[in-house]
Amino acid sequence: MIIKEILAELETKDHPVAKPLYKKEGIKILMLGFKKGMILKEHKAHVPTKLVVLEGKVIYKSEAVEIELEKYDEFEIPVNDLHAVNATEDTVCMLIQG
């Protein structure tokens, strides 16, 4: 029920909501929810990470690339790449780390 929890929390939040879906040694799966216009501020991924858009649309932006990702798109986030994610629609994403 993680995605439902995220969607419920988004009703009262002004920032993206993240919750772990799965965690085991060497791998972690996080679910992220955004309302349209929300921004995940600049940060770095310190381990290999894949961003998968399950619903909605986001813009992944770093110094090296700016790419629009929509439903079912996936993107390999380079390790230590300073980036931000901007939701252009209400969005649910999955982050696979490890």
Q: Where does each model-flagged region fall?
A:
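Ligand-binding loop in jelly-roll beta-barrel domains
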Residues: 79-98
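A short, N-terminal "cap"/entry segment at the start of jelly-roll beta-barrel domains
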Residues: 1-26, 61
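A cytosolic small-molecule/anion-sensing beta-strand core signal
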Residues: 54-55, 70-71, 89
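Glycine- and acidic-residue-biased ligand/ion/polar-headgroup-sensing regions
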Residues: 47-58, 63
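Conserved short histidine dyad/triad with adjacent acidic residue
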Residues: 15, 28-45, 79
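Short acidic-glycine-tyrosine-enriched beta hairpin
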Residues: 64-79
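A short, compositionally biased micro-patch
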Residues: 24, 35, 46, 53, ...
